[in-house]
Amino acid sequence: MVVHWYNNHMVQTPKHAIVVERIQTGVRMEKRLLKVLKALAELKDMTLGDLLEGIVLHAFEGKAPFSSQTLKEIEKLREIYGLRLTAADSHQLKEQKR
């Protein structure tokens, strides 16, 4: 096992990288939400895909994906990009007609 830090959390991973098959996907997301996610990925020096995989894998196990420090950084990014949506808004968003 290798011990390293991810999002200010100590993480143990297998000594060798886990080989996976990734596919390209085209998902539509709320514009400001995507801006915050991209900025966070840049801040953490990772790809957007890696960030999303981490968030989803944590959620599948009922674990919080972010440390308190990262949550503070997210709040700043939300303010910068005007993202006021919350978890209560999920599954209620309707796409604006062009």
Stretches with model-predicted labels:
Residues 6-7, 38, 75-78:
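Residue-level detector of alpha-helical secondary structure
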